[in-house]
Amino acid sequence: MNSELFSPYTIKDVTLKNRIVMSPMCMYSSENEDGQVTNFHLVHYGTRAAGQVGLVMIEATAVLPEGRISNKDLGIWDDSLIEGLHKTTTFIHDNGAKAAIQLAHAGRKAELETDALAPSAIPFNETMKTPVEMSKHQIKDTILAFQQAAIRSKQAGFDVIEIHGAHGYLINEFLSPLSNKRTDEYGGSPENRYRFLREIIDSINEVWNGPLFVRISANDYHPDGLTVQDYVQYTKWMKEQGVDLIDCSSGAVVPARIDVYPGYQVQYAKHIKEHANIATGAVGLITTGAQAEQILNNNEADLIFIGRELLRNPYFPRIAANELGFELEEPHQYERAPGKISTNK
């Protein structure tokens, strides 16, 4: 039986064997607080590759030490971190998948002892510290840090880079009028609020020619915040700059009540795909093969990002294939265990 979910997908010169992407999820497991990959990361990501995920995207990886969400985040701010990341991509490639990295800066959500940086001195909520408004020098240094991180990503063997522009972290803070009250060229109009991300994309394009994704929060869930229609213009600009795919998440730039249900963010992937004419990834409570297949068949997205379901079961692709009646080619080491596997959770 044919399946869209298990059909290949090519972006530039990178071909994914199927449409399943492991969504980036922080593991907070750099136990020495030095940003280094540990044995846990090798097993964690290698197992999902062996489980037949098409693209394994490692977690938000900080471009600067002060840009970590926590002290135990992975980092890519120094050349000494390349070796561990290269081991990770080798594990992923050896098990049949492509490897992606999400480059990130936590901004005002950095829970560290040092000052948190943000476009404006506005805390996320009443319990978190008030960040320091970034100077233009700090902005330029951060843009350079993203560029240097892209160089290291290439040296580490990654096939795809994703820029983390969602979930209330630094880039998202610049994009949203709820967190960006600047009066210079980095604040005010949508064009100005986009400038920080524009300059990051330009800087990465100077050193990286592989597939480039951007994760967005397509809805601020606030009456004065951004909606998916605002992101249509942002993503049109991203496409003009050469971004290949928009990973469509939502929320977390300010505290908000969100009506969560299966596939609740698919609408954003569909809207951006249709109105910005750019490839999209759907993410958020996608938990079955049938659900993923329907999203693709309805042309609502091009890739399916799976998060918590892959934490529950690293062999989710096998379960999805069984559900869809698709004969998935197994790793040769597992050929002695043919047939269906349980879908019980």
Curated annotation (Swiss-Prot):
Its cofactor is FMN. CDD domains: OYE_YqiM_FMN (cd02932). Substrate binds at residues 28, 164-167. FMN binds at residues 23-26, 60, 102, 215, 307-308. It catalyses: A + NADPH + H(+) = AH2 + NADP(+). The keyword Chaperone does not apply. Its EC number is 1.6.99.1. Keywords: Detoxification, Flavoprotein, FMN, NADP, Oxidoreductase. It holds the Pfam family Oxidored_FMN. GO terms for biological process: response to toxic substance. GO terms for molecular function: FMN binding; NADP binding; NADPH dehydrogenase activity. SUPFAM superfamilies: FMN-linked oxidoreductases. PANTHER family: NADPH DEHYDROGENASE C23G7.10C-RELATED. Homotetramer. Catalyzes the reduction of the double bond of an array of alpha,beta-unsaturated aldehydes and ketones. It also reduces the nitro group of nitroester and nitroaromatic compounds. It could have a role in detoxification processes. Belongs to the NADH:flavin oxidoreductase/NADH oxidase family. NamA subfamily. This is NADPH dehydrogenase. The lineage of its organism: Bacteria, Bacillati, Bacillota, Bacilli, Bacillales. The gene is namA.
